[in-house]
């Protein structure tokens, strides 16, 4: 069983799936392979990283309603550390390191969510280079070593899923 973190958003690349996976794999120094459908993916320690585009317009509409912006990609970080603290912290640090690196891409707009679209499970948002941490996400206080990955000064706000 894994804990899935989804970085959902607008990724301004000509080929979002390929460019995003290769960008993150380079950050984590991991080799990219292809899954059974021919899509790029990779594993780094206990993280499995893959991505997918919205299949139907309904999926995009749902995201637009919940997030307030259009999405063209979901980047998934599946953490298979199974609750082992050291591995889990390292996996989440690597995920945050990857997301922060993507934040520097001009025009990128996305949110990082743990498991489901709930206010308290939003970790952060990225809007054209600006990283905003969710004040309601308990992980920032529980895991100071994860927060340390985010460049200072930290900008906290209360982030919401739209009704």
What do these predicted regions represent?
Residues 26-30, 93-94, 131-132:
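Short, low-complexity, polar/charged sequence segments that are solvent-exposed and flexible
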Residues 30-86:
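Short, intrinsically disordered low-complexity segments
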């Amino acid at each position: 069983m894994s804990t899935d973190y989804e970085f959902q958003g607008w990724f301004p690349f000509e080929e979002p799936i390929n460019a995003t996976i290769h960008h993150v794999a380079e950050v984590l120094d991991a080799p990219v392979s292809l899954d059974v459908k021919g899509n790029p993916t990779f594993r780094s320690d206990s993280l499995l990283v893959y991505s997918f585009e919205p299949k139907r317009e309904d999926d995009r509409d749902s995201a637009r309603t919940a997030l307030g912006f259009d999405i063209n990609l979901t980047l998934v970080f599946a953490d298979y550390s199974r609750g082992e603290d050291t591995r889990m912290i390292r996996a989440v640090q690597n995920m945050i390191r990857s997301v922060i690196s993507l934040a520097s891409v001009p025009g990128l707009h996305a949110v990082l969510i743990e498991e489901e679209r709930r206010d308290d499970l939003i970790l952060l948002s990225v809007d054209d280079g600006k990283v905003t941490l969710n004040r309601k996400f308990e992980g920032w206080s529980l895991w100071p070593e994860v927060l340390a990955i985010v460049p200072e000064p930290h900008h906290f706000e209360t982030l919401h899923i739209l009704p």
